[in-house]
């Protein structure tokens, strides 16, 4: 939606400038580089091209860099392995790493000193299983962040929230050392692609101003995930982030 693009309209074609703007103007505490162009069903950009872009962004900022693949396991395996190699020692955070590609990405991340985002489809047992597989491979669990899969407002959020509560209870109450990891939620990606975030006021007058609506959807989602134990929120709109930070300061 245009509302999501507006704060970055002067840098949309330049990932390095975009990242620097997020840090310098909007005080981003970390940067997330979402590798949409590598999707085989989209531009199918090469692993080498993606790696060079990641390296340039990493060298241009002084905050942590999270690299999020296209969620096609085979392509992510190739791309994230190459990024691990090209960005040796940059201590990137790489994901999503699933059961299907954990060996290739896990080995590369270990070899080149990166952190991993273990991803599973809204299920406590599957989240634990991916962590066990990574640990069996030799990955230290203190280099793993858990992505339980994130839904936007509605049923998706409720499912994700419920699973995150159970993950937290298993880790803290039951002492399950395979689940005592920080959790990450790729919230902005889900909120801004949903129908309600894009509908103009002519189509849905009862939902109010489209820009404000989507900003509030993202902020409400952020607060919900914070309450369920999230450690890292990936958000898109600066105003949504301000609202989420205001909530944190109240706690």
Model region roles, listed by residue range:
Residues 11-23, 79, 216-224:
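Short, acidic/polar
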Residues 30-31, 65, 144, 233:
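Hydrophobic residues within beta-strands of alpha/beta enzymes
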Residues 72-76, 99-102:
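Short acidic loop-to-helix transition motifs that present clustered carboxylates
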Residues 27-28, 62, 114, 230:
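A structural motif
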Residues 21-26, 54-60, 81-88, 104-112, ...:
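Acidic (Asp/Glu)-rich catalytic clusters
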Residues 2-3, 27-57, 61, 68-74, ...:
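Glycine-rich, proline-tolerant flexible connector loops at the mouths of alpha/beta enzymes
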Residues 100-247:
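Catalytic alpha/beta core domains of metabolic enzymes, predominantly
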Residues 1-17, 42-45, 69-73, 95-96, ...:
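Active-site mouth loops of central-metabolism enzymes
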């Amino acid at each position: 939606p245009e509302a999501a693009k507006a704060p970055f309209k002067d840098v949309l074609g330049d990932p390095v400038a975009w990242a620097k703007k997020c840090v310098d103007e909007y005080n981003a505490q970390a940067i997330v580089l979402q590798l949409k162009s590598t999707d085989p069903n989209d531009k199918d950009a090469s692993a080498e091209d993606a790696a060079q872009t990641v390296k340039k962004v990493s060298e241009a900022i002084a905050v942590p860099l999270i690299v999020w693949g296209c969620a096609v396991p085979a392509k992510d395996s190739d791309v994230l392995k190459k990024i691990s190699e090209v960005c040796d020692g940059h201590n990137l955070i790489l994901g999503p790493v699933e059961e299907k590609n954990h060996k290739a990405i896990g080995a590369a991340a270990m070899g080149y000193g990166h952190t991993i985002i273990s991803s599973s489809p809204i299920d406590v047992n599957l989240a634990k299983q991916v962590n066990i597989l990574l640990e069996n491979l030799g990955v230290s669990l203190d280099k793993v962040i858990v992505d339980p899969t994130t839904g936007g407002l509605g049923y998706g959020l409720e499912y994700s929230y419920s699973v995150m509560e159970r993950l937290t209870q298993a880790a803290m109450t039951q002492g399950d050392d395979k689940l005592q990891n920080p959790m990450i939620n790729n919230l902005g990606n889900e909120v801004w692609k949903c129908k309600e975030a894009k509908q103009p006021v002519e189509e849905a007058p009862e939902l109010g101003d489209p820009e404000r609506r989507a900003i509030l959807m993202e902020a409400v989602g952020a607060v919900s995930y914070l309450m369920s134990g999230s450690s890292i929120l990936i958000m898109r709109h600066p105003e949504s982030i301000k609202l989420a930070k205001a909530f944190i300061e109240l706690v």
